[in-house]
C-alpha cells in the first residue's frame, strides 16, 4: 500500500482520489473485516453519501496498482465515520491483501461515494435479500431506514454456515431495538440447502408485492431471487440489484468478428491504437496512455460512460444506462467489448 503524505489528503488528485487515514479495522468474521476511515471535517461534504453506496479504493500491491469498490456498511444518519466491509475472495488480490495487512494509521486513496443501490420508494416497505458479503450495502440501508422512518424492514440473509454470518450481533441488536418493525430470517446452506424460489416467494408474500426489494450477493443467489420476485408479481422497477462481480470477458470464437483498431477521443485528444483481444474500451483507453474516467469498473456507477460514434460494442454488464441511452450509442466503457472491425468512441 502506498503512503501518501498528510498534505496529499487535503484535496482529491487528478483521478478523483483522496488519501484517508484508517481509524480502525474490525474483524467481523474469520474472512471479513470492516475498515473505518477517519474523514477530516473539511472533507465531510465531499464524502457525504446515501445508504447503499460504495467507495472506490486505490492501492498498490507488489508494485501493481489496483482499484476496487467496496460498499459502505455504515449509515449516514447513525455514523460520522465511513466504514466499508471486505470479505476475502479466494482469488482476490486486494481483498486478501487488505484482510491480511490493513491496520490503523495506514492511508488509502479513496474516491467520493457513488452508487445507485439506494432507497427509492420510501413510502413502500423495504424488503432485502442478502447473500454472504452482500449484506454490506443492505445493512447500511436497513440501519438508515429504521433510524429515520417509522416503516418496517425485512431481511432474508443467506450464508453457507453460522460462522460466516457478518454483523450477526448488530442485526440481533436491531431486532431487539426495533421489535416488530424489523423482521430478520437467517438461512444457512449447510443446514437448509441453497435458497429456493419457493422460499423467496413465501418471504415476499409476507410483505406483499408493493414492497421495495433490494438484492445483493453471489450471482446465482441474485438470479434466483430476481426471478422469484418477478414471478411473484413484484414490478421490475421495484427490484434493485447490486452486483459485486461481473462476468469474465469471453474468449472470441474462431468465427467472431476481429476488431483491428480502436479510436478514443478524450479532452480534445484523439488516439488510435491496435485492439488487443479480450480488452474493454476502458482498458484500451488506458493502454493508449489516456487518463480515462472510471470508478466502480463493474458497469454500475456510470463514471466511464462514452458515446460510440463509429462501429459497435456489446456490454458485459450494465446497471448504469437505460435502453434508450444504449440505443443512442452510449456505453459504459469498463464493460464494453468491440464487435466491429473498427470502433471510435468519445468521452463527453
Named regions from a protein language model:
Residues 96-265, 270:
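FNR/FR-type flavoprotein reductase catalytic core
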Amino acid at each position: 500500500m502506498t503512503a501518501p503524505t498528510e498534505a496529499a489528503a487535503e484535496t482529491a488528485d487528478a483521478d478523483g482520489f483522496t488519501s484517508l487515514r484508517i481509524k480502525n479495522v474490525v474483524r467481523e468474521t474469520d474472512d471479513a473485516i470492516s475498515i473505518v476511515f477517519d474523514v477530516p471535517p473539511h472533507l465531510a461534504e465531499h464524502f457525504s453519501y446515501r445508504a447503499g453506496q460504495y467507495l472506490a479504493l486505490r492501492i498498490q500491491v507488489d508494485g501493481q496498482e489496483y482499484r476496487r469498490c467496496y460498499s459502505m456498511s455504515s449509515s449516514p444518519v447513525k455514523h460520522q465515520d465511513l466504514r466499508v466491509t471486505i470479505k476475502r475472495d479466494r482469488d482476490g488480490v486486494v481483498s486478501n491483501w487488505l484482510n491480511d495487512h490493513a491496520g490503523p494509521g495506514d492511508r488509502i486513496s479513496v474516491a467520493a461515494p457513488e452508487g445507485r443501490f439506494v432507497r427509492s420508494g420510501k413510502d413502500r416497505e423495504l424488503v432485502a435479500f442478502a447473500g454472504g458479503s452482500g449484506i454490506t450495502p443492505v445493512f447500511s440501508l436497513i440501519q438508515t431506514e429504521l433510524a429515520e422512518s417509522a416503516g418496517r424492514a425485512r431481511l432474508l440473509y443467506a450464508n453457507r454456515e453460522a460462522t460466516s454470518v457478518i454483523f450477526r450481533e448488530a442485526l440481533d441488536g436491531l431486532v431487539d431495538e426495533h421489535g416488530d418493525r424489523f423482521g430478520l430470517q437467517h438461512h444457512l446452506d449447510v443446514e437448509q440447502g441453497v435458497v429456493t424460489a419457493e422460499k423467496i416467494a413465501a418471504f415476499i408474500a409476507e410483505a406483499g408485492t408493493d414492497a421495495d426489494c433490494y438484492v445483493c450477493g453471489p450471482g446465482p443467489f441474485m438470479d434466483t431471487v430476481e426471478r422469484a420476485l418477478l414471478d411473484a408479481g413484484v414490478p421490475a422497477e421495484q427490484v434493485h440489484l447490486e452486483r459485486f462481480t461481473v462476468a469474465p470477458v469471453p474468449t472470441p470464437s474462431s468465427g467472431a468478428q476481429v476488431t483491428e483498431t480502436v479510436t478514443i477521443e478524450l479532452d480534445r485528444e484523439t488516439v488510435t491504437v491496435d485492439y488487443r483481444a479480450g480488452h474493454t474500451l476502458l482498458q484500451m483507453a488506458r493502454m493508449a496512455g489516456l487518463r480515462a474516467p472510471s470508478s466502480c469498473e463493474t458497469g454500475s456507477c456510470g463514471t466511464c460512460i462514452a458515446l460510440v460514434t463509429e462501429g459497435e460494442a456489446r456490454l458485459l454488464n450494465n446497471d448504469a444506462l437505460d435502453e434508450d441511452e444504449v440505443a443512442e450509442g452510449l456505453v459504459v466503457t469498463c464493460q464494453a467489448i468491440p464487435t466491429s472491425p473498427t470502433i471510435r468512441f468519445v468521452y463527453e
